[in-house]
Amino acid sequence: MSDIEQRIKQAVAEQLGMRAEEIKNE
């Protein structure tokens, strides 16, 4: 896996985590 792919996956995981937190707070 390339470095760019790893960074994209990390960014997506962070965004999904943030969305999950937002849904929990509502």
From Swiss-Prot:
Keywords in alphabetical order: Cytoplasm, Fatty acid biosynthesis, Fatty acid metabolism, Lipid biosynthesis, Lipid metabolism, Phosphopantetheine
Keyword Lipid metabolism in annotation: yes
GO biological process terms held by the UniProt record: fatty acid biosynthetic process
Entry GO CC: cytoplasm
Modification comment: 4'-phosphopantetheine is transferred from CoA to a specific serine of apo-ACP by AcpS. This modification is essential for activity because fatty acids are bound in thioester linkage to the sulfhydryl of the prosthetic group.
Pathway: Lipid metabolism; fatty acid biosynthesis
Protein location: Cytoplasm
Listed InterPro entries: PP-bd_ACP
Carrier domain sequence ranges: 2-26
Transmembrane feature ranges: none
Main localization category: cytoplasm
Function recorded in the entry: Carrier of the growing fatty acid chain in fatty acid biosynthesis.
Family listed: Belongs to the acyl carrier protein (ACP) family.
Protein name: Acyl carrier protein
Native species: Acinetobacter calcoaceticus
Gene expressing this chain: acpP
